[in-house]
Regions:
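Alpha-helical segment proximal to the catalytic Tyr-Lys
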Residues: 126-127, 168-172, 229
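Conserved glycine-rich cofactor-binding loop
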Residues: 11, 18-19
Length: 245
C-alpha cells in the first residue's frame, strides 16, 4: 500500500523559488503532491528552476517589493482557483554596521523583507483556502545579534511579530501562520563569503556546520502539511542550536 503524499492535490506559492531554500522547498512540495507557483526576479534563473523541478510547477517572474508584480503572480495562481500554502521565502541579506548604515540600505531591506513579505501574504488572502497555511522565512538573526546585521535582524524580527498578529487576525478562517528561522545555511548567499568568514560563522553553531536547504525545506513541509494542524503563531528555529546558546 503506497504512502499518502503530504501535500496531495494542494496548491502552493513559494516566493524566491529559484535557488537555495525556496528551490529545495519547491522540489519537495511537488514530490509530496503539490502544484507549485514559484517566483524569481531573473527570468533565466526562473526558467532553470522550473526545469529542475520538472513538473507541476509554474514560474512567474517578479519582485515581491513591486505590488504590480504580486498582482500578476496571483492572477496566474487564480487559474488554479485557490491557494492552500503560501511560503513567503524571498528576502535579501546585506551587512552594514551602525555608523555606516545608509538610507538606501535600510529602505532596501525593509522594502523587500518586510513590505514584500506582508503584501505577498495579504494579496494571497482572497485565494487562500480556509484552513490553509502561511509560512514566512525568518532568521536566527531575529533573536541573535550579529555584527553589522542590525537592519537585517530587525526585518526578520518584524516577521515574528507578523505571525503573532496574523494568528489572531485569521483565527476565524482557521489559517495557520508560522515563521521558520534558519541559522546559517549553505545557499548562494554564502557562496560569496571568504573562507575565514565562513569558518567564523560555523564556529558559532553548536552542531559544528551550516544547515542545508533540504533541511529547511523539510520543516517548511511540516508546517505546510496537516502534520502541523495544531501549530500556529510560532517561530521555529532550524539553526543547529545557534540561537539557543
Amino acid at each position: 500500500m503506497s504512502e499518502t503524499k503530504k501535500l496531495q492535490g494542494k496548491v502552493a506559492v513559494i516566493t524566491g523559488g529559484t535557488s537555495g531554500i525556496g528551490l529545495a522547498a519547491a522540489k519537495l512540495f511537488v514530490k509530496e503532491g503539490a502544484y507549485v507557483f514559484i517566483t524569481g526576479r531573473r527570468q533565466k534563473e526562473l526558467d532553470e528552476a522550473v526545469k529542475a523541478i520538472g513538473s507541476n510547477v509554474t514560474g512567474v517572474q517578479g519582485d515581491i517589493a513591486n505590488l504590480t508584480d504580486l498582482d500578476r503572480l496571483y492572477k496566474a495562481v487564480a487559474t488554479k482557483g485557490r491557494i492552500d500554502v503560501v511560503f513567503a521565502n524571498a528576502g535579501v541579506a546585506e551587512f552594514a554596521a551602525l555608523g555606516k548604515i545608509t538610507e538606501e540600505h535600510f529602505d532596501k531591506l525593509f522594502e523587500i523583507n518586510v513590505k514584500g513579505t506582508l503584501f505577498t501574504v495579504q494579496k494571497a488572502l482572497p485565494l487562500l483556502k480556509d484552513g490553509g497555511s502561511i509560512i514566512l522565512n525568518g532568521s536566527v538573526a531575529s533573536v541573535k545579534g550579529a555584527a553589522a546585521f542590525g537592519v537585517y535582524g530587525a526585518t526578520k524580527a518584524a516577521l515574528r511579530s507578523f505571525v503573532r498578529t496574523w494568528t489572531s487576525d485569521l483565527k476565524d478562517r482557521h489559517i495557520r501562520s508560522n515563521v521558520i528561522s534558519p541559522g546559517p545555511t549553505d545557499t548562494p548567499v554564502i557562496d560569496g563569503q571568504p573562507a575565514d568568514a565562513i569558518a567564523r560563522i560555523v564556529s558559532t553553531i553548536p552542531m559544528g556546520r551550516m544547515g542545508e536547504p533540504d533541511e529547511i525545506a523539510k520543516v517548511a513541509l511540516f508546517l505546510a502539511s496537516d502534520d502541523s494542524s495544531f501549530v500556529t503563531g510560532i517561530e521555529l528555529f532550524v539553526d543547529g542550536g545557534r540561537g539557543q546558546v
